[in-house]
């Protein structure tokens, strides 16, 4: 009977540990990327991004763990749309009902812009739904999650930088 010794190249204990470490880090990174993507889950604004974000003529931007105008944001997501304003407005009414704080700008008896402060996602992690309506069914919806106060939101929206 002949005994063969199997030789596995690069299969030392050190490389096995390194391979395991790489796999664990990859899984953790994937989980970290999924969490911000689910940030607005439970809010109606999530439906707006899902339904209209990839529609022709729409522009959607999503940034995670970024700085915008000097403010540190965990999630920034915006949608510029060219139609479906009435449908989007109806969807956002659901978030309005659940909002902790509501700020709206009214022109000629019509709400044209504003923001809703939602319940925090975690301690010191506030969530905001901002919107602006234009003419012809156009408008913008923004979701922000971060350590921002309502005053910070007002500064972001109305400062001239």
Regions found by a protein language model. Give the residues of each.
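Mature extracytoplasmic domains of secretory-pathway proteins
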Residues: 75-121
């Amino acid at each position: 009977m002949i005994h063969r010794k199997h030789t596995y190249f690069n299969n030392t204990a050190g490389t096995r540990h390194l391979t395991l470490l790489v796999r664990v880090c990859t899984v953790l990174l994937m989980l970290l990327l999924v969490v911000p993507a689910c940030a607005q889950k439970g809010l109606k604004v999530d439906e707006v991004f899902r339904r209209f974000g990839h529609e022709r003529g729409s522009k959607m931007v999503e940034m995670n763990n970024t700085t915008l105008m000097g403010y540190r944001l965990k999630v920034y997501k915006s949608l510029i749309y060219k139609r479906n304003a009435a449908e989007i407005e109806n969807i956002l009414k659901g978030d309005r009902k659940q909002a902790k704080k509501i700020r709206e700008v009214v022109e000629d008896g019509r709400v044209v812009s504003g923001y809703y402060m939602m319940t925090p996602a975690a301690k010191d992690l506030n969530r905001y739904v901002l919107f602006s309506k234009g003419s012809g069914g156009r408008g913008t919806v923004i979701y922000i999650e971060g350590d921002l106060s309502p005053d910070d939101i007002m500064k972001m929206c109305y400062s001239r930088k």
